[in-house]
Amino acid sequence: MKILKGNLVSAPALGKLEIVEHGCLVLHDDGSIQSVEKAVPQNADAEVIDYGDSLIMPSFVDMHLHAPKYPMLGMGMDLPLIDWLNTYTFKTEARFEDSDYARRIYKKLASDLITSGTTRVCMFSSLHTDATLILMEELEKAGVTGYVGKVNMDRNGSPELQETTEQSKRETLRWLDACGRFQTVKPILTPRFTPSCTDELMSWLGKLAAERGLYVQSHLSENKGEIAWVKELCPDCAQYWESYDRAGLWKDHTVMAHCVHSDEREREAMREHGVVTAHCAGSNINICSGVAPVRTLLREGNLVTLGSDIAGGALLAMNKVITMSIRASKFRHMQSDGKDEFLTVEEGYYLGSSAGHEYFGGHGGFVPGDYIHAIVVDDSDFTEAAHPLSVRERFERAIYMMHRHNIVSVWSEGKNVVC
C-alpha cells in the first residue's frame, strides 16, 4: 500500500472542480485507488510519499495525434489541409518504412508524452505495420497507455505512401496478430479518412471491427474542401458521416477528430451512436479549418474530448491544448455576441483529462477502484503573486503556465513512471 500526500485537484464532472487541500490518495498494492482522505489514516501500514505543497491532479489524455508527423512540427502552417498533406505529411510519413528511423522518433515521442503528463492516447501511426508495432512498444515501455492504429489508405495518397486494397487488408491482419504481446497499448482500426479508403476497404474494416470487437478512429468534417471532396467520392451519401455508417464504422466508442463543420443532423447522429469528438483547436486554427462548436456539442449531449493533433497542432503538452481550446471557444463566444458560452478552465481541464479517462473505462476525478493516472505539479518557481493564492488559483495558473519541468512525478496505470 502507498499513500500520496499533496493538494488533490480533480474534475469529476464538466465544470466541477474537486479540491482536497493537503489530502491523501491511498493506493492498493496494484496501484488502484483505495480511498481519498483528508489526512493520513491512523495506523496505516503504508509507504507515504509526501509531495509537500505540490498539486496532485489526474493526468492528461490526448485523444487525437499522428505519431509519424512528430518530425514535422511547425512546418507548413500557412497551407490549407489538402495542400499541407500533399506537401509535407505524406513525404514525412513515408520515412517510417525505415524501422530504425521509426524507433528513434517514436522513442522520443513516447518520452515527451509521458514527461508532459499525458498517460493515455488515441493515436494514429502510419500505414507501416512494423513501424506501428515499434510505436506501440515504445509507448508501453515509457508508460503511455491507450490505443494505436495502423493507418489504412488504399487511394488518394502518394506514390510512396499508399497501399493496394489487398495489401491494406493483409497488413492489418498481420498487425493485429502481433498486437497480442502488448498489455496496456491496444489496437484501434484506423481508416485515415473517407477520401483515403475505397468502399471495399471501408466495408471490410467495418466487418473486422464487428468480428473482433475493435474500436475505430478517423476524421470528420474538418474543413469545407474535405467535405466537398467526400460528396464527390460518395454521391449516394447525403452527409459525410454516412460514408462511415454504411461501412459499419459509425458506432459506440468511434473517435472522430475535428467535427468543425458538423451540422445539426451530423451531431445528432454522433449522439445517437455514441461517437466521440476529439476537438483539436490548435490544428483547426493553424490550418484555417475553423473552430468547432464545442459548446453546442456539449449542450446537445455529445461526448467531447481533446487532441493535440500533432502536427497540425504544434503543441504536444496537453495543458497548452486545453488553453488553446479555451481561447478558441472565446472566438466563438465573441462571434456569437455572447450567445455561445466559452469554456471555463474547469471545463477545459475536464475535457483534456477526465473525459478521456472515461473513454478508457475510468472516471472523472480520483475514484476508488480506478488505477491511478496522475501528475504531480510543483509550481514553486512561478512568479510570486501579490497575494496568497488558493489551490483553485494555483490550479488555474498551472494549466496556463506549467512546463515539463514543473511535472515532477507521473503515475500511469497504477505505476510511478516518472519520479
PLM regions: where:
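N-terminal metal-binding scaffold of metallo-dependent hydrolase/deaminase domains
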Residues: 1-43, 55
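C-terminal cap of metal-dependent C-N hydrolases
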Residues: 13, 371-419
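Divalent metal-coordination and catalytic microenvironments
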Residues: 25, 31, 53, 64, ...
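Active-site gating loops and adjacent loop-to-helix segments of metal-dependent hydrolytic enzymes
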Residues: 71-104, 150, 155-165, 223-251, ...
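Alpha-helical scaffold segments that flank or form the walls of functional sites
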Residues: 73-144, 168-181
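Metal-coordinating catalytic core of metallo-dependent amide/deamination hydrolases
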Residues: 130-259
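His/Asp/Glu-enriched, well-ordered alpha-helical/loop segment
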Residues: 246-253, 295-383
